[in-house]
Regions:
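Conserved phosphate-donor/acceptor-positioning beta-strand/loop module used by diverse small-molecule
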Residues: 446-469
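PAPS-dependent sulfotransferases, especially Golgi type II membrane carbohydrate sulfotransferases
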Residues: 252-253, 265-276, 286-354, 405-423, ...
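Conserved alpha-helical positions within TPR/SEL1-like repeat arrays
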Residues: 16, 43-54, 77-88, 111-122, ...
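Phosphate-binding active sites in nucleotide-utilizing proteins
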Residues: 348-448
């Protein structure tokens, strides 16, 4: 090489070497030197676009790639990179177009199938995502990333066994893929396998010690198993690696209230004013600021911060949440009213004895479940399994009908689903709890499938529940981030349960939370009698259990003895909520 007068090819080699070393500035300078001599040097434009992408200047990267594709319209590498750049700019439909064009030119292009599958996953086009990712794996079975995203897709499809299998395959191919360990932990946690969940998070952290997400998830797992000191340490590690992520402070503040000092308040206000702060961060900043107002009993300001926080949180997941709101207020009502089963010649004999606990969030259902599960029999507690909802919605999609089929076949399928959750055991006479609160939508279905099932409707003062829902970040409940939707959801719940009870009197046990906490022994005895279970003092000593697990917003309170709740505690909020509740007789 002539160092005084290198060729363009030699200069490009030098630019690539500097790019690989991370010296982006020198690489960029060399690229522009080449383009000053030959403005249409294709490889240089591609490299310069990669440099811009590394610097997160995706607009510039897209411009350079468009210039490159004009030079060579059928270049699959450029099309792939254009798709990825559009994806970073949030132009997901354009990204899909580029990936599909790349596949049209090269039907065996693994990267294009992987990128297309990953983009469809981001758009929650799950069936399409699954198909494209499986094609990428077929073309290149030793490529770990498609297995990782396919695992994520299976989680969203509630195919937990397939998700576990795909994450494990990703790990087998590339053990150092920290995201696969972390996401595998999330599945184990969803299945209440906390031992394996915690192990997975720790492996992710060992591979990548600054994996803030894994530290956060480890903290939640510790919190849900009652290991609060370990949870605090893990939240603090998440903060160490993401000091401006306000979600970490929000979750830590539940366990360590003294962090809510003036210094943190100033930091929160500074962060949420930044132009590049994410909607999720602004949401958690407002949630935190509401806690300061709650401490000083400035109820109107507290609610205003909560309203703002929930708006930002909803908008950070707008596409997904708008779909879920429609599902909760339109689809679920149609399903509740329309699902049918075939009972011809069916016998009412079945092996399992489920105890369903229904209601709205923050109604005392966690307390009720722990009382039932802590008696002499120590029956398995399912918490919020979502088994019925997932089963019903999947069946409707498969059959394209509200007729779900024969009762006997449905019972067999549900038996297997509950068994996979570890809830069915001869040791406990196949008795277990399912505390999926929105099972009130499936009351008619439950009665037809399990005519001898026990159903407990947990009722609490509406104002208390509504304020508690709005104060707590119930992350995945799309309707819980808007007061109008909360009131509407309550009204649907009250109408559905009232209508069912009129047709089926005494089938559902109506439990009043306030009565339970004011007279726990008397009310818990009545409850256990209804369930057909023996009562003992252990029922009220649930908080002493070493194996107590709770993933609900009550997981801190549930580790203490029952205490009385004053209705007056929430009265100051009523005047601010009247504008939402005035059209509902049950609120006035």
């Amino acid at each position: 090489m002539n160092k005084n007068n290198p060729t363009l090819k030699e200069t490009l080699v030098a630019a690539r070497q500097n790019y690989r070393k991370g010296d982006l500035k020198t690489a960029e300078t060399l690229c522009y030197k080449i383009l000053s001599i030959n403005p249409n040097y294709l490889e240089t434009k591609i490299l310069l676009a990669s440099i811009s992408a590394q610097e997160k200047n995706y607009i510039k990267a897209k411009q350079l790639l468009n210039e490159a594709i004009d030079i060579e319209p059928n270049n699959v590498i450029i099309l792939n990179n254009l798709g990825t750049t559009c994806k970073q700019l949030g132009e997901l439909k354009n990204a899909i177009g580029y990936y599909k064009k790349a596949i049209q030119i090269d039907p065996n292009n693994t990267n294009a199938y992987y990128n297309l599958g990953a983009t469809c996953y981001d758009l929650k086009q799950l069936k399409e995502a699954k198909s494209y990712l499986q094609k990428a794996i077929e073309l290149q079975p030793n490529f770990a990333l498609p297995f990782l995203i396919l695992g994520n897709t299976c989680v969203d499809l509630k195919e937990y066994e397939n998700a576990i299998s795909n994450y494990q395959k990703a790990i087998d191919i590339n053990y150092n893929l920290a995201g696969a360990h972390n996401n595998l932990g999330l599945v184990f946690r969803a299945l209440n396998d906390f031992k394996n969940a915690i192990s997975c998070y720790k492996k992710a952290i060992k591979i990548k010690k600054n994996h803030a997400g894994a530290h956060h998830n480890l903290a939640l797992a510790f919190k849900e198993t009652g290991k609060f000191n370990e949870a605090i340490k893990s939240h603090e590690m998440a903060i160490k690696y993401e000091p401006e992520n306000l979600a970490h402070y929000f979750y830590l503040s539940d366990l360590k209230k003294d962090i809510l000092d003036i210094d943190l308040k100033n930091k929160i206000e500074k962060i949420i004013r930044k132009n590049n702060t994410t909607k999720n961060n602004v949401a958690h900043g407002n949630y935190l600021l509401s806690k300061y107002e709650q401490k000083t009993k400035n109820y109107e300001k507290e609610l205003n911060f909560l309203i703002k926080g929930h708006q930002f949180y909803f908008n950070s997941r707008k596409t997904k949440f708008e779909t879920l709101v429609k599902y909760n207020f339109d689809d679920m009502l149609q399903i509740a009213n329309g699902i049918e089963v075939e009972k011809l010649g069916e016998k009412n004999k079945y092996e399992i004895k489920p105890i369903f606990i229904i209601g709205v969030p923050r109604c005392g259902s966690t307390l009720v479940e722990k009382i039932i599960g802590s008696g002499e029999m120590f029956i398995p507690m399912g918490e919020e399994t979502s088994v019925l909802e997932e089963f019903v919605t999947t069946k409707i999609m498969e059959k394209k009908s509200l007729n779900l089929g024969k009762v006997s076949e449905i019972r067999n399928e549900l038996f297997n689903k509950y068994k996979k959750r570890g809830l069915i055991s001869d040791k406990f006479s196949n008795i277990f709890t399912d505390k999926s609160l929105n099972n009130f939508f499936f009351l008619k279905f439950i009665k037809e499938i399990y005519p001898n099932a026990k159903i407990i409707n947990c009722k609490r003062d509406a104002l208390s529940s509504i304020v508690s829902i709005f104060r707590n970040q119930l992350t995945e409940l799309a309707w819980a981030h808007d007061l109008n939707n909360i009131f509407k959801y309550f009204d649907n719940y009250l109408q559905i349960t009232r209508n069912f009870n009129e047709i089926n009197p005494n089938f559902v046990y109506e439990l009043q939370f306030e009565k339970l906490v004011n007279n726990p022994e008397k009310e818990s005895k009545k409850l256990m009698k209804f369930c057909g279970l023996p009562w003992s003092k252990k029922c009220l000593e649930f908080y002493k259990r070493k194996d107590l697990i709770s993933k609900t917003a009550s997981n801190i309170q549930i580790r203490s003895a029952i205490y009385k709740h004053s209705l007056e505690r929430y009265l100051p909020y009523k005047k601010f909520l009247n504008q939402y509740g005035k059209k509902y007789s049950w609120f006035n």
